[in-house]
Regions:
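Active-site recognition of the HExxH zinc-binding catalytic motif
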Residues: 1-14
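Active-site nucleophile-His-acid catalytic modules used for acyl/amide transfer and hydrolysis
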Residues: 16-21
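Post-HExxH zinc-binding segment in Zn-dependent metallohydrolases
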Residues: 22-61
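Extended alpha-helical scaffold/coiled-coil
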Residues: 46, 50-72, 86, 114
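Pan-zinc metallopeptidase signature
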Residues: 67-126
Length: 126
């Protein structure tokens, strides 16, 4: 998971820089959480039956470093909760209906959104 998160951060910063768009720490964390879920999920053969287990492993009982500031802790908690909500909606709307290709299309659009738009999209999809 750490490798996926690191690659996610690197690529997302590069994509945003190429578009001359700034990116917040919360936006980085949220995208990395979504990327971890999707990466783990797509490695499995049966996406529909695997999604709940992957969600549980990634989001149900996260462990945060003890030395985080209150702001850092809040950022990680917010990213975790939003990504969990989004992952649940992806499962419900796409994976449960064997619509992986449609999900990937949505994820490409989601990737391009700025933080506020991502959070609004998650709230609407919930």
């Amino acid at each position: 998971c750490l490798a996926v998160e690191g690659v996610s951060h690197f690529v997302y910063v590069a994509v945003c820089a190429a578009a001359d768009r700034s990116v917040s720490a919360l936006e980085l964390e949220l995208q990395a959480e979504v990327d971890k879920f999707i990466t783990c999920l797509l490695m499995a053969n049966d996406h529909n039956s695997t999604a709940p287990q992957v969600r549980s492993l990634l989001f149900d009982e996260p462990h945060y470093a003890n030395d985080l500031s209150a702001e850092e802790h809040d950022r990680y908690v917010t990213a975790n909760r939003a990504a969990n909500t989004y992952a649940a909606s992806l499962h419900r709307r796409f994976l449960a209906h064997d619509r992986t290709n449609d999900m990937l299309h949505e994820l490409r659009a989601f990737y391009r959104l700025a933080l506020d738009a991502k959070l609004n999209h998650i709230a609407r999809a919930a």
